[in-house]
Structures are given as structure tokens and as C-alpha cells.
Amino acid sequence: MAGPQDASLEEILWRSPPHVQMMGGYLHSNNILFYFAESPFFDATSNNASLAIQANYNEAFRHFVETREAFEGRLRTMQGLEFVVAYDPLQAAAQTDTQFAHEPSNVWVIRKQMRRKRAGQEDEVVVLATFFVVGDCIYMAPSVASVVGNRILSAVTSLTSLLKTASTLPIFTPAHGHTYLPPAPKPADAGQPGVPSQQSKENTPMPDAENPARVPLVGSQAGNTASTFQDTRTLAESLHLFLRYEDEYMDENPLVGEPGSFIMSKANDVDRTATAKQPQSTIPTKMGAPLVRVDTPGKGPEKVGTPSSSDESSLKKKKGGVGG
């Protein structure tokens, strides 16, 4: 299991140009392990460090550090922690001793492994870590658990950000349920027969002109539009309910009077008040026939049709004129 120190080593890069200059100016097969020993990835308790110290103080071990083959051959006879070269680009590209089949990649692979000796059997080797040397830069290869963990963390972070953004979009209304955008009202004259469907061409946008109405509403714009629509809808419903139930009261004895002098009315008073408020009957009655006055003879002093004295004198004058 990788500890806290191993986790931090996966995030660093180490290089040392001065050590490269001290080792001849470039890295090759015989000095790559000694260059790696100067990095923080190296373990001072490994067999590599023990063999290098013995070669410095014992002439009998000096030849083990002259070539990498001899050095790794000596490590295979020891038991414990060791660092070996798993991939050598120079050997992989070499065709003969003096020619290369292709250009070397200059990428080295070094493994940290634990070797255990078993009697009569091959050694048991357990790989603990892998390192890459690219040019003079040394990296530690991440473990599979670290790679998978980082990918899962990245996916979870993206999903969390998505849910935070999407949580502000749904709108709930009793009429429409859960919606992400407010329903667009239908035009009033869209389905009416007889209404011309031709529209004015004055405001027709040109093909190369941007139409701001086609820009989608996102984020706060969609929220503001939905809030305005909901407020307008609530106001219309409230006005409709008021006009429908304005004469109904929840109390058995409603308040009557003017503001500042309200009194509790009784049920009988309410009935009388309601009866008084009812308009009088305005049902038209049948019109009778016109009255005709008929004069009948009676005892009155007045005589109907009696000529006056002036009329009699005028008649006499006419008769006299005719006779003469």
C-alpha cells in the first residue's frame, strides 16, 4: 500500500544538471543508476546503496560498479530491496556494437523491487514502484488506484457542478407540474378561422443579421422569466377569485358598518339587509284598452248640441238675404 510519502512522490519531478555534468555530460547505461541514486526517489537502505559503499572502501568490490551488468549481477545474488533498469533505450535501439537500428528514445525505466531467496527455486521478486527517466528528468509512475481515483474524483466533481446548475432550472406549478422552462403562451389568433395568417414583412430580419430572440435563456435569465410569468399568473388567479367570491363571507355574522365603527350583525339583520338590497319588481303589466267616454242623457242642466244666441242671429240674417 502506498503511504503518504509515496503519494507525494507521484506529484514531483526531479532533475539535476550538475550531476549530469559530473558524470560525463550525458546519461548512459553505466551511470543511470548512480544518477537515480541522487534523487529523492532512492532508498538509502537498499542493496544498491550498500554495494556502492562497499565498493568505495573495498577494492575487491570496485569492479561491480564499473558496468551496469556487473552491478545488477551482484544485486541478484543479494536478498532485499533493490533498484534495477527494466528498459534501456540504447540496448533496445542497438543493432550492432557501433550502429543503431533506430534513434534511441532516451527514456529509461527503473523498477523498485523486493527480492527474496528461496532454496531450490527461483527468487521471488515483487515490484513495488516504477520510475521513468526522460532526458535528465525523473518521474514516478502513478499506481492504478491513483489513476482510477483521480478519474472518479474528476467525474464526481463535474456531476456536482452540473447538479448545482440544474437545481435552479426546474419550476413547479400545480397546473403544469415540474418544468424546466415556462410554457410559451399560444398566440390568440393562431387557430381562429377567417383571420389572415400573413404577417408584416417590415420587421423581417435579414439572413446575416443576428436574431436576439433566438438566443437561449440560461441561468439567471431563465429564472427571471419564469418568476415574472408565475407572478403574472398568480395575480390573474387572485383577481378572478376575488370577482367570483366577493359577496361570500367565511363568518356566520359578518362585520357591517364603516371602517372604524364595525359591528357584528345578527343573522336576521343580515337577511333583512339582503332583502332590502333586492331591487323592486319591474315586471311590466298589461296595458288596458283606451277608455272611451260615452255621454248619456241625464238630469244635468247642460244640453248637448244646443245652439247659442250668436249662432241664431247669424242664421236669421242669412234667411233674410235669401228671401229679398
Swiss-Prot record:
It comes from the Eukaryota. Residues 221-230, 275-284 have a biased composition (Polar residues). Pfam families: Med6. Keywords: Activator, Nucleus, Transcription, Transcription regulation. GO terms for molecular function: transcription coactivator activity. InterPro entries: Mediator_Med6, Mediator_Med6_fun, Mediator_Med6_sf. Gene3D superfamilies: Mediator complex, subunit Med6 (3.10.450.580). Belongs to the Mediator complex subunit 6 family. PANTHER family: MED-6-RELATED. Component of the Mediator complex, a coactivator involved in the regulated transcription of nearly all RNA polymerase II-dependent genes. Mediator functions as a bridge to convey information from gene-specific regulatory proteins to the basal RNA polymerase II transcription machinery. Mediator is recruited to promoters by direct interactions with regulatory proteins and serves as a scaffold for the assembly of a functional preinitiation complex with RNA polymerase II and the general transcription factors. This is Mediator of RNA polymerase II transcription subunit 6. It comes from Aspergillus fumigatus (strain ATCC MYA-4609 / CBS 101355 / FGSC A1100 / Af293). The gene is med6.
